[in-house]
């Protein structure tokens, strides 16, 4: 359960995020939908406590990420915008390294990696060095690495960006599995079909503000559109703003 | 700070960098072997050249040989090869066709027979390097010898004891030992040792900070429930470990190349026993911490690997400063100097090279002084990463 309350961030004179609030509840997939540069990555970075919001707060399972970032991070599994695998390590070594940093026992790391290798279909490349991996292989390893400690809250920044159909479907299936297990999933995206296909709740962000929040049906009803893309364009104030 | 997590980070950085052959080659092999091997080659080549020149037949270009036939006969009897010079002596020296040219003045024979100083002109280039000097000195010694022997004969002919000319006799007592003469030769050693450890940690300092930022793996790494200072401390530990490894290898490489130093030919000696090596290691070890920390701090401010390489490369000049200073300026060492990082190491190692027993308080001061500065810099490096600006390359 992630609760974001009125967070803001400015970089110099540019206001990147202003007064953003949203709730991501357990057992649901929540999307942060916005165009490029709308403030998705900055919002996500504040939510996963990498940077400090100038005002407002973020609670992860009731823990204030600002006051106790280390405890809050233990409750989260994050796939950041930057996948950043270690190229000189194998996929498995990448995953094990993060397991150790999560403070897991070697046995727990082993069991959990086997499970993730199975679920994400990584068996064919798990013992290879990640240098030269395809985009899809890289995202899978990065997800496995982020979720090695089986966190309750899963945050992903544009998880299917640049992936082919097969990889995209594999990731979607994986996220739906996680939802079924009662996890709280929050991901940011600018791809309408993506959001439409997997999300229960959608928060639309534009120019650093949340302009609408609700289920897809609710957003369509509110705007009177028959698809999410049209609804999105209507909500962010028309195409002239793009 | 959680030591287990620190170790996890440290071991991962070491594993990752050992797999990068280029890093291992450049930092460890270059850092450790470059200095000792370069020293062996340079010393041997110069000494062999000088020795060859000293043993070879001396060749002297002479202008106006007929002017001083007696002197010429003497030189030939001393196995000097006399060459008649065509052209001006100035040009012969300038275009290096001869090391030294002897010109006999026109009135040499007259002055000689009158018992007045007869002039010969010696052309040479006093700023010439190396072996040319050997020829000049040999010729000067020969002419001085001739001068003395003729002078003595003249006095004896007049019934005067040549000893009257010896008013003061200098008896030299050179207090230089074999070791201290060797120390002069080896005064670049501290520099190579310090340089080696700076080079050894350089690539890790860059790779674990600016490199990781450039590869965008810093963000996912910091998302783990590990305090940033623990992660940085782990990285710094790996960096320092590489510096230490290079240091140990440099010492071993130097020890192993010692038999190839031309000490015998120079009447010099250097005894590098286990105790000397251990003291060197002891005073240099905290410098590895200092080097790693400084390099990490500088690399932290760089946005890319390349930028970091430029800045950190400049830091390699720092260890040169005290070594250069000591080479050209004979500083009277004071105890407090031992506490100054790099300077203290230079002084202690120079004393060891001279074969002097180094006082334990000097060693302790060099160790503690550098350790304190190193720890302070390490603390700054570790805390730097609490700043958000340090995290992203974009």
Language model features with spans:
Chain A
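Conserved ABC transporter NBD signature motif
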Residues: 24, 56-67, 71-72
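Catalytic Walker B motif of ABC-type/P-loop ATPase nucleotide-binding domains
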Residues: 154-158
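Conserved catalytic motifs of ABC-family nucleotide-binding domains
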Residues: 150
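Conserved ABC ATPase "signature" region
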Residues: 96, 100, 107-125
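Conserved ABC ATPase signature
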Residues: 88, 129-133
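ABC ATPase "signature
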Residues: 213-214
């Amino acid at each position: 359960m992630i609760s974001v309350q009125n967070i803001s961030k400015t970089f110099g004179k540019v206001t990147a995020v202003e007064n953003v609030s949203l709730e991501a509840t357990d057992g649901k997939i929540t999307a942060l939908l916005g165009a490029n540069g709308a403030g998705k990555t900055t919002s996500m970075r504040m939510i996963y406590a990498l940077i400090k919001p100038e005002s407002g707060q973020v609670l992860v399972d009731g823990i204030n990420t600002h006051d106790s970032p280390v405890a809050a991070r233990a409750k989260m599994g994050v796939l950041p915008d930057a996948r950043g695998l270690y190229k000189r390590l194998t996929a498995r070594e990448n995953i094990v390294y993060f397991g150790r940093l999560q403070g897991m026992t070697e046995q727990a790391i082993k069991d959990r990696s086997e499970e993730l290798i199975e679920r994400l279909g990584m068996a064919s490349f798990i013992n290879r060095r990640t240098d030269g991996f395809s985009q899809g292989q890289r995202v899978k390893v990065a997800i496995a690495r982020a979720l090695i400690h089986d966190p309750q809250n899963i945050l992903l920044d544009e998880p299917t960006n640049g992936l082919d159909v097969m990889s995209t479907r594999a990731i979607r299936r994986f996220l739906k599995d996680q939802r079924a297990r009662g996890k709280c999933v929050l991901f940011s995206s600018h791809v309408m079909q993506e959001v439409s296909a997997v999300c229960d709740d959608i928060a639309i962000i534009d120019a650093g503000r949340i302009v609408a929040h609700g289920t897809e049906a609710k957003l369509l009803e509110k705007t009177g559109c028959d698809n999410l893309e049209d609804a999105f364009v209507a909500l962010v104030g028309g195409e002239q703003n793009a | 700070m959680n030591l287990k997590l620190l170790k996890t980070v440290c071991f991962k950085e070491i594993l990752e960098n050992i797999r990068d052959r280029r890093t291992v080659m450049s930092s460890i092999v270059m850092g450790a072997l470059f200095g000792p091997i370069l020293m062996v080659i340079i010393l041997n080549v110069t000494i062999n050249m000088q020795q060859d020149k000293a043993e070879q037949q001396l060749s002297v270009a002479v202008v106006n040989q007929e002017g001083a036939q007696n002197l010429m006969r003497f030189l030939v009897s001393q196995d000097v090869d006399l060459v008649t010079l065509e052209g001006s002596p100035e040009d012969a020296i300038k275009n290096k066709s001869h090391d030294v040219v002897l010109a006999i003045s026109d009135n040499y024979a007259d002055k000689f027979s009158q018992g007045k100083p007869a002039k010969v002109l010696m052309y040479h280039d006093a700023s010439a390097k190396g072996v040319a000097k050997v020829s000049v000195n040999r010729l000067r010694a020969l002419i001085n010898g001739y001068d003395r022997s003729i002078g003595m004969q003249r006095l004896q002919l007049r019934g005067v004891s040549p000893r009257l000319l010896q008013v003061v006799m200098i008896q030299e007592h050179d207090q230089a030992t074999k070791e201290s003469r060797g120390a002069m030769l080896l005064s670049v050693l501290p520099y190579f040792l310090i340089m080696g450890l700076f080079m050894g940690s350089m690539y890790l300092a860059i790779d674990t900070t600016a490199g990781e930022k450039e590869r965008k793996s810093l963000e996912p790494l910091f998302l783990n429930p590990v305090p940033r200072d623990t992660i940085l401390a782990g990285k710094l530990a790996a960096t320092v470990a590489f510096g230490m490894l290079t240091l140990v290898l440099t010492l071993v490489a130097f020890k192993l190349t010692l038999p190839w130093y031309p000490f015998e030919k120079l009447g010099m000696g250097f005894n590098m026993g286990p105790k000397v090596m251990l003291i060197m290691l002891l005073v240099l070890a905290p410098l590895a911490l200092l080097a790693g920390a400084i390099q990490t701090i500088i690399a932290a401010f760089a946005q890319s690997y390349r930028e970091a390489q430029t800045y950190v490369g400049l830091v390699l000049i720092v260890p040169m400063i005290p070594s250069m200073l000591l080479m050209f300026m004979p500083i009277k060492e004071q105890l407090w100097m031992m506490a100054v990082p790099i300077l203290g190491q230079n002084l202690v190692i120079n004393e060891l090279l001279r074969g002097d027993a180094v006082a334990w308080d000097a060693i302790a001061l060099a160790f503690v002084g550098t350790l304190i500065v190193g720890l302070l810099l390490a603390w700054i490096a570790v805390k730097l990463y609490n700043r958000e600006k340090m995290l992203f390359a974009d």
